[in-house]
From Swiss-Prot:
Entry-linked SUPFAM superfamilies: Ribosomal protein L1 (SSF56808)
One GO term (biological process): regulation of translation
Origin species: Amoebophilus asiaticus (strain 5a2)
Alphabetical list of CDD domains matching this protein: Ribosomal_L1 (cd00403)
Family per similarity comment: Belongs to the universal ribosomal protein uL1 family.
Subunit: Part of the 50S ribosomal subunit.
Name under which the protein is recorded: Large ribosomal subunit protein uL1
Keywords annotated in UniProt: Repressor, Ribonucleoprotein, Ribosomal protein, RNA-binding, rRNA-binding, Translation regulation, tRNA-binding
Disulfide bond entries: none
NCBIfam families: rplA_bact
PROSITE patterns in alphabetical order: RIBOSOMAL_L1
Length: 232
């Protein structure tokens, strides 16, 4: 991290990292204490009151952030020949089948999302050991195994992200970039939180939103007050 100026140090010292802030305040603080030459990502960590070891408490799905993440996601579509034109016209970065399966088997994973078709999954399945650990394995639950290729590609390009609790019950996601307006970051964060609330498992007991933290790629985390209703 670059050496802080006197003004930057003063701003950082004003932030009480033991305190919880309203969502808008937390966003503003993270923007102020981020000093990088690149447009850092602003990430949210939401600790849910679930036990991911139980199948009925595995929270995962997708959400379309109204202002996107600020990142142009590289999409690979593995499809049959008659779907290739549709995929390209929708904005897919890479389109094909056997040639890309071979490339992946040889170690190529320079992509962010893979979209495929149900009838192709038998071939894609053998890539599980490579794609699974990287979070790239297509899944019907996240809309990446579908016959509606164009719709799936357009959704990802317009800001659709996947979320999934880790083994500690925490959902990690990007809600935009430091350069975004405070309002855009707030809208994105609220959309994710609203989606997580709707996805609350019926078997989850006690407090559901246990804690929320915001941080940029190079900043400390700022806690968000979970006692507010966030406007919904």
């Amino acid at each position: 991290m670059a050496k802080l100026t006197r003004k930057q140090k003063a701003v950082a010292e004003q932030c009480d990292f033991q305190k919880s802030y309203k969502l808008e305040e937390a966003i503003e603080l993270v923007q102020k204490i981020t000093y990088t030459k690149f447009d850092a990502s602003i990430d949210i960590a939401v600790h849910l009151g679930v036990d991911p070891r139980k199948a009925d408490q595995m929270v995962r799905g997708t959400v379309v952030l109204p202002h996107g993440t600020g990142k142009n996601k590289r999409i690979l579509v593995l499809c049959t020949p008659e779907k290739e034109k549709e995929a390209r016209e929708a904005g897919a970065d890479h389109v094909g089948l056997d040639d890309y399966i071979k490339k992946i088997e040889e170690g190529w994973v320079d992509i962010d999302v893979i979209i495929t078709m149900p009838e192709i999954m038998a071939k894609v399945g053998r890539l599980g050991k490579i794609l699974g650990p990287r979070g790239l394995m297509p899944n019907p639950k996240t809309g990446t195994v579908t016959v509606e290729i164009a719709k799936a590609v357009q959704a990802v390009k317009s800001g659709k992200i996947e979320y999934k609790v880790d083994k500690y019950g925490i959902v990690h996601a990007s809600v935009g970039r430091v350069s975004f307006s405070k309002e855009a970051l707030r809208d994105n964060a609220k959309e994710l939180l609203a989606t997580l609330l709707k996805a609350k498992p019926a078997s989850a007991k006690g407090s559901y939103l246990k804690s929320i933290s915001l941080a940029s790629t190079m900043s400390k985390g700022v806690d968000v007050d979970t006692s507010t209703n966030f406007g919904f």
